[in-house]
Each structure stands twice: as C-alpha cells, then as structure tokens.
C-alpha cells in the first residue's frame, strides 16, 4: 500500500482553503455592498429598514456553500493528519459559532418538495421566522459568524503551513 505524501496533502488543502477563503470574502463583500446601497425604508426611524425586495439572495447562498466547504475540508484535514487536538478544538469552536449551518445549507443544496425552507427569509443573513415575530439566526456573514469562519480557516492554514515547513526543513537538512 502506498504511503500518503502528507506534504502534498497539505499543499492541496492549502490551495483549496485559499479558494474557500476568497469565496467567503467575495460573497460577504457583495452582501455588505448590496445592503449599503439598498433603498432605505423609514429612514428617519430608530431602526431604518433596507429594501432588498427583488434580490434573489444568491450571494448569501454562495456564502453558505463556502461555509459548508470550509466545514467539510476541516473534517478532511483533521482526518488526514490524525486528529490534531488544536484542529479538533478549532472545529468545535466553528460548529458552536455557526450551529445552524447544515440546517440551511443542506436544503439549499438538495432542494426537494418539503417545508425545510418555508420559514426561512433571506436578508443580509438567513433567518428562520418564528411565531410571534421572532427570528432564529441561521447564517449571518456580517459579524461574529464570519469571524468564527475566518478563525477556523486561519487555524487550518496555520497548521498546514507549519506541516509543510517541517517537511521542507527536514528535506533540506537531509540534503546537507
């Protein structure tokens, strides 16, 4: 059985993480720009409302997809590199910080004839509308959840870069 080249694995994962991070940042910026430029309803009230009528929410959907890709690649990295505790802990923080990611992502990716998205509304975040007018946050790219995602990405990338550095140092030492 061939031995896995962990240096190549780390490089592949870093490339994928770079694309995921770029996607998260691009979609987040589009969401923020759209909200900043949307018409204001009740502009003189304490809580001015922005009018996102007609926006299909694609940028938010793509942001959610990228979050799920980050979650999936994190699990793969953890598995390939033998469950490093620092990454297991980072994964736990990610999942605690965005607990409803799969609640929204799975029906977005695999639509079918059920009610999973019937009470979901897309604004600058995806929320589930509750009785009495309250909402349950599913994914919000504007604030803490984005910071949680970026922290997870950083933990994964830092671990992988250190892994490559160790391999590179070992190779250069052996060559001497």
Role assignments for model-derived ranges:
Residues 1-97, 123-176:
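Amphipathic alpha-helical interface segments
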Residues 94-119:
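Histidine-centered, metal-coordinating catalytic motifs and their short helical/loop contexts
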């Amino acid at each position: 059985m061939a031995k896995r080249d962990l240096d190549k694995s780390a490089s592949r994962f870093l490339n994928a993480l770079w694309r995921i991070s770029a996607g998260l940042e691009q979609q987040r910026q589009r969401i923020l720009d759209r909200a900043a430029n949307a018409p204001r309803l009740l502009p003189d009230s304490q809580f001015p409302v922005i009018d996102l009528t007609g926006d299909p929410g694609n940028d938010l959907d793509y942001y959610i997809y990228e979050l799920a890709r980050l979650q999936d690649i994190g699990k793969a990295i953890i598995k390939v590199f033998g469950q490093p505790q620092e990454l297991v802990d980072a994964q736990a923080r990610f999942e605690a910080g965005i607990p409803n990611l799969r609640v929204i992502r799975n029906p977005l990716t695999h639509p079918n004839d059920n009610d999973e998205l019937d009470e979901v509304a897309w604004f600058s975040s995806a929320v589930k509308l509750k009785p009495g007018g309250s909402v349950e946050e599913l994914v919000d790219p504007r604030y803490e959840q984005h910071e949680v995602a970026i922290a997870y990405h950083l933990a994964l990338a830092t671990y992988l870069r250190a892994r490559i550095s160790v391999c590179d140092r070992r190779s250069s030492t052996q060559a001497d």
